[in-house]
Amino acid sequence: MSSTVELASSFIEGAPPGEALTSDGSDIIPSLAPAFERYNEKQLTTVKLPGASQEVIVSEFNKIEGNRYFDVESQTSFGVDHVTQQASGAQSYVLESQNADLIHVEVHSRSNQCSKSLLKSLAKHAAEHYPNCSYGVYPTEDDTAVAILLVANRYSPNNFWNGRFRSIYRVPVSESTTVSGKILVDVHYYEDGNVALNTNKPINIAIPSISAESIISRIAAAERDYQEELNRAFVQMAEGAFKNLRRQLPITRQKVEWEKVGGYRLGQDISGGKGR
């Protein structure tokens, strides 16, 4: 059983976006719960809170005791069934962090000027650039930095493709002026084939100050630059490597009718029939 669990776990953790599925009634499913948990946290899986429409992120950054997670924006903690990706047991949650002001509290100065929080600035960035996405800002475990997460999913199984965009950043709250992180893009296309795109782009951003608006504007620029870089790469591949691989017809100059493959000599040879 252990080898079966290990094999199944590896399939789960390597599943493309939106394709970590289970079958009802399988005795092995409970043993795979740890693999589903690792998958959900790594992929920034999103779940809907009970009675809410907005999806929130599940990750290692917002995990608390008791296999629960918290969402800063809604000030809620919740449990997760990692196999079904369902949230439950929502409770009020108050963030305790020395960086709470930077994360989600808008500070008004004596001159009555409002300093936006990272969460507010990130929400604006997400609304402008990602039609459907979830985001979060969380303190790191030692409270020396802040984690910024954004995930956008697009599932189109009827058209045989699914995709996910993730970005993860670490913002130090010391004197450092560099935000480090990564952008990950995963796309799976599986109509009449199996094509996958998996990218991992390291990001290092110099910031002039620990200001929410400045940090998010630099992040937005980095994400825009990377998307443009991907677009250029797609064009080059389509006009170069992929074009050279493409063949409209096989060498026989006739299309293979796969549903009639038994009628071909090769099909008959394989099935033990006579060749023509």
Curated annotation (Swiss-Prot):
A GO molecular-function descriptor: actin filament binding
One GO term describing the cellular component: mitotic actomyosin contractile ring
Claim: Mitochondrion is one of the keywords in the record: no
InterPro entries: CapZ_alpha, CapZ_alpha/beta, CapZ_alpha/beta_2, CapZ_alpha_1, F-actin_cap_asu_CS
Subunit relationships: Heterodimer of an alpha and a beta subunit.
Family named by the database record: Belongs to the F-actin-capping protein alpha subunit family.
Role description: F-actin-capping proteins bind in a Ca(2+)-independent manner to the fast growing ends of actin filaments (barbed end) thereby blocking the exchange of subunits at these ends. Unlike other capping proteins (such as gelsolin and severin), these proteins do not sever actin filaments.
Protein name: F-actin-capping protein subunit alpha
Organism: Aspergillus fumigatus (strain ATCC MYA-4609 / CBS 101355 / FGSC A1100 / Af293)
Gene: cap1
